[in-house]
A protein has these predicted regions:
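Conserved glycine-rich cofactor-binding loop
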Residues: 10-12
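Hydrophobic positions on the long internal alpha-helix
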Residues: 68, 83, 114-122
Protein backbone atom coordinates (compact mmCIF):
# COMPACT_ATOMS: atom_id res chain seq x y z
CA UNK A 1 0.00 0.00 0.00
CA UNK A 2 1.26 3.48 -0.82
CA UNK A 3 1.27 5.78 2.19
CA UNK A 4 0.84 9.51 2.53
CA UNK A 5 1.29 11.62 5.64
CA UNK A 6 -0.62 14.79 6.38
CA UNK A 7 1.16 16.96 8.93
CA UNK A 8 -1.35 19.38 10.40
CA UNK A 9 -4.34 17.19 9.54
CA UNK A 10 -7.62 18.89 10.28
CA UNK A 11 -11.24 19.08 9.16
CA UNK A 12 -10.64 21.25 6.07
CA UNK A 13 -7.81 20.75 3.62
CA UNK A 14 -6.33 17.81 5.52
CA UNK A 15 -9.63 15.92 5.52
CA UNK A 16 -10.22 16.60 1.83
CA UNK A 17 -6.73 15.42 0.85
CA UNK A 18 -6.98 12.36 3.10
CA UNK A 19 -10.33 11.44 1.61
CA UNK A 20 -9.12 11.90 -1.97
CA UNK A 21 -5.89 9.92 -1.57
CA UNK A 22 -7.50 7.36 0.73
CA UNK A 23 -10.25 6.53 -1.74
CA UNK A 24 -7.51 5.99 -4.35
CA UNK A 25 -5.99 3.28 -2.14
CA UNK A 26 -3.39 5.20 -0.16
CA UNK A 27 -2.90 4.53 3.52
CA UNK A 28 -3.14 7.87 5.30
CA UNK A 29 -1.17 9.01 8.35
CA UNK A 30 -2.94 11.87 10.12
CA UNK A 31 -0.51 13.92 12.22
CA UNK A 32 -1.55 16.83 14.43
CA UNK A 33 -1.03 18.22 17.92
CA UNK A 34 -4.47 17.09 19.03
CA UNK A 35 -4.83 13.31 19.23
CA UNK A 36 -8.57 13.72 19.78
CA UNK A 37 -8.94 15.76 16.59
CA UNK A 38 -7.17 13.22 14.38
CA UNK A 39 -8.99 10.31 16.06
CA UNK A 40 -12.31 11.95 15.16
CA UNK A 41 -11.11 12.60 11.61
CA UNK A 42 -9.95 8.98 11.19
CA UNK A 43 -13.36 7.72 12.35
CA UNK A 44 -15.06 9.97 9.81
CA UNK A 45 -12.70 8.78 7.05
CA UNK A 46 -13.26 5.12 7.98
CA UNK A 47 -16.94 5.61 7.13
CA UNK A 48 -15.73 6.45 3.60
CA UNK A 49 -13.54 3.33 3.43
CA UNK A 50 -10.26 5.19 4.01
CA UNK A 51 -7.48 3.48 5.97
CA UNK A 52 -6.18 6.22 8.26
CA UNK A 53 -4.02 6.04 11.36
CA UNK A 54 -3.45 8.83 13.86
CA UNK A 55 -0.27 10.23 15.36
CA UNK A 56 0.26 13.17 17.69
CA UNK A 57 3.12 15.62 17.16
CA UNK A 58 3.97 19.28 17.54
CA UNK A 59 5.89 20.55 14.50
CA UNK A 60 7.84 22.93 16.75
CA UNK A 61 9.12 19.94 18.76
CA UNK A 62 11.06 18.07 16.10
CA UNK A 63 11.54 14.82 18.07
CA UNK A 64 7.75 14.42 18.28
CA UNK A 65 7.40 15.06 14.55
CA UNK A 66 10.07 12.57 13.53
CA UNK A 67 8.70 9.99 15.99
CA UNK A 68 5.22 10.38 14.48
CA UNK A 69 6.58 9.96 10.96
CA UNK A 70 8.58 6.89 12.04
CA UNK A 71 5.51 5.35 13.68
CA UNK A 72 3.43 6.10 10.60
CA UNK A 73 5.94 4.37 8.33
CA UNK A 74 6.13 1.37 10.65
CA UNK A 75 2.33 1.12 10.80
CA UNK A 76 1.34 1.90 7.20
CA UNK A 77 4.52 1.41 5.18
CA UNK A 78 7.03 3.84 3.69
CA UNK A 79 5.67 7.36 3.26
CA UNK A 80 5.78 8.38 -0.39
CA UNK A 81 3.61 11.50 -0.29
CA UNK A 82 3.85 14.29 2.29
CA UNK A 83 1.53 17.22 2.89
CA UNK A 84 2.72 19.82 5.40
CA UNK A 85 -0.12 22.19 6.20
CA UNK A 86 -0.47 23.01 9.89
CA UNK A 87 -2.17 26.32 10.68
CA UNK A 88 0.15 28.90 12.25
CA UNK A 89 -0.63 30.33 15.65
CA UNK A 90 -2.26 33.76 15.63
CA UNK A 91 0.52 35.25 17.75
CA UNK A 92 2.92 34.60 14.85
CA UNK A 93 1.17 37.30 12.85
CA UNK A 94 2.64 40.57 14.06
CA UNK A 95 3.00 43.86 12.19
CA UNK A 96 6.47 43.95 10.67
CA UNK A 97 7.50 47.15 12.42
CA UNK A 98 6.52 45.63 15.78
CA UNK A 99 8.40 42.37 15.18
CA UNK A 100 11.74 41.77 16.85
CA UNK A 101 14.22 38.93 16.36
CA UNK A 102 12.87 36.99 19.37
CA UNK A 103 9.38 37.11 17.84
CA UNK A 104 10.64 35.09 14.88
CA UNK A 105 11.72 31.98 16.81
CA UNK A 106 8.29 30.32 16.79
CA UNK A 107 7.46 31.13 13.17
CA UNK A 108 10.87 29.90 12.00
CA UNK A 109 10.51 26.65 13.95
CA UNK A 110 7.03 26.21 12.48
CA UNK A 111 7.64 27.33 8.89
CA UNK A 112 11.22 26.21 8.28
CA UNK A 113 12.46 23.65 10.80
CA UNK A 114 9.23 21.61 10.81
CA UNK A 115 8.87 21.13 7.05
CA UNK A 116 12.60 20.56 6.55
CA UNK A 117 12.62 17.87 9.25
CA UNK A 118 9.52 16.24 7.76
CA UNK A 119 10.89 16.21 4.22
CA UNK A 120 14.27 14.86 5.33
CA UNK A 121 12.58 12.13 7.33
CA UNK A 122 10.38 11.03 4.47
Amino acid sequence: MTTMAIVGAGPGLGAAVARRFGTEGFGVALIARSQERVDALAAELADDGVTARCFSADVRELPTLTAALESAAETLGPIEVLQYSPIPQKDFMLPLLETGPADLVGPIEFSIYGPVAAVQHV
